[in-house]
Amino acid sequence: MSEGTLYDKVWDRHTVTKLPTGQDQLFVGLHLVHEVTSPQAFGMLKERDQEVAFPERTHATVDHIVPTGNRDRPYRDEAAENMMAELEANVRGSGIDFSDPDSGNQGIVHVIGPEQGLTQPGMTIVCGDSHTSTHGAFGALAFGIGTSQIRDVLATGCIAMEKQQVRKIEVTGELGEGVTAKDVILTIIGKLGTDGGVGYVYEYAGEAIEDLGMEGRMSICNMSIEGGARAGYVNPDETTYEWLAETDAFADDPEKFERLKPYWESIRSDADAEYDDVVTIDGSAIEPTVTWGTTPGQTAGITEPIPDPDDLPEEDRDTAKRAQKHMRVEPGDTMEGYDIDVAFLGSCTNARLKDLREAAAFVEGREVDDDVRAMVVPGSQRVRDAAEAEGIDEIFIEAGFDWREPGCSMCLGMNDDQLVGDEASASSSNRNFVGRQGSKDGRTVLMSPIMVAAAAVTGEVTDVREMEEVATV
């Protein structure tokens, strides 16, 4: 087993006891709650006449079902209104801080945690959402959990978990023009597979990772679960500390920041740490990358041919054939030129201010293709407000994008923003499963925000490097 890694250090410091099951009981530093996976857990507490053990370590928001258009209450969708009302009652009855739509702080749970400084290095973080691994970008151990585990954490502040192995993924070299963190993680999943990380936590390292800002690191850690890993993280460094210093937690309390910084530095993986596996990927060889199929592992560089299923391992052939039939693609073709109907820029993977800035810089002076409906859904109210202060909203609106309120939106078919029929979308989200964006016949192509912007203006999947004024992001 691994030794001397950040994962080992943080795990050991949060272990309360070894359980008879062989699992460890871990103390949870931060529990993030949203409207979809928490009602049943709160209901179980009420049945047992239990209270939330650590409301001060719990924070709630609404994101999955909240409309990104008309937000007048009651919501048009009765189920959404009921979930919202139940969350409001549960959190306020428990004394839990709530970033509600009237607070100015509402947003996707994995966007608001980092921007408010709730997410910090060396913490254990859980949430009833698959993409909780996002917070690992700060050097935290962050895990998605199920309903019964949500109940356990609410009631005790602890969770039972089995320790994983640690795989170090080194991305060496410098990323090229038009290549982003999203391309890096799609490449990693494409190489290792959607189940390649089962039993592992991923530590991301190497020059290409170190050169990324926090937004890029969050995009990579966000999709760790899509590669089968239980979590993913990046060791904290000066880039991390600079972000944290400007958050609510520390902007007005620099002394607190200085007190905690030595701890953050101490949890970094040792120079001689031992890993269970090490994978090295040449970052300079990565090109803009998109999905061609119906899993995040079915990827190809924009100039690479779609594989022939018969050339794949036997266990992957049938899945690939079904995916190619659904997506209407042929082996040997590339995804460049694939027609799209919808361009979606949003989700917990890619809806932060930097994502919007870079896409807007590309879009400025261009127009959305006449046959494309395009939308931008900021990750939080703070992101939206900051973007509007910079005039980013006007750039998108003038180009023909719909500028919306924050929420999960078209990442999943759980709100009003959905594909219709067999529409094909260029999406900056994290999952391209059949039916994920609301229509069982819909087709989703995952890509970076700047690639979404390029697809929106051309009406097809486009190699952004072939267009003018492309920045390295």
Curated annotation (Swiss-Prot):
It catalyses: (2R,3S)-3-isopropylmalate = (2S)-2-isopropylmalate. GO terms for biological process: L-leucine biosynthetic process. GO terms for molecular function: 3-isopropylmalate dehydratase activity; 4 iron, 4 sulfur cluster binding; metal ion binding. Residues 289-319 are annotated as: Disordered. Pfam families: Aconitase (PF00330). CDD domains: IPMI. Residues 307-317 have a biased composition (Acidic residues). Belongs to the aconitase/IPM isomerase family. LeuC type 1 subfamily. Catalyzes the isomerization between 2-isopropylmalate and 3-isopropylmalate, via the formation of 2-isopropylmaleate. Heterodimer of LeuC and LeuD. This is 3-isopropylmalate dehydratase large subunit. It comes from Halorubrum lacusprofundi (strain ATCC 49239 / DSM 5036 / JCM 8891 / ACAM 34).
